[in-house]
Amino acid sequence: MAFTDKAEFNVPRHIVQKGGVNPETITVNKTLTYKDSQYQLLRNNTGSLDCILPAYKDGASFWIKNRASSTHNIVVKDVDANTIATLAAGEGVLCVSNVSAWWDVIKG
């Protein structure tokens, strides 16, 4: 897709995403849907768990952070069980999708 320089979309106010943040403690794998918050702040207090992204969708994105204070990882996977990122305690990732894949854009 190509963009043009015509008619930029301007937002003259700050953006508020009501319900867009989900701080949650997980004890089992978490499967996301497009009804879930875009920002997932997950605390994993058990062994390594998976956070499974929804089906591929052009332009979709999720921010996922491992809020654990222990050594328990969260493995972010796509719907086909491919690993996108492994998050140690305190790490987060921005995942973006097109119609055929998820990618990790920023991780740290």
Give the positions of each predicted feature:
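Exposed extracellular interaction/assembly regions and N-terminal maturation sites
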Residues: 2-76, 98-108
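Tight coil/turn sites that cap or link beta-strands
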Residues: 37, 88-92
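Short, surface-exposed secondary-structure edge patches
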Residues: 53-54, 84-86
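Short edge-strand/loop segments of extracellular domains
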Residues: 78-84
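Generic beta-strand structural signal
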Residues: 88, 97-98
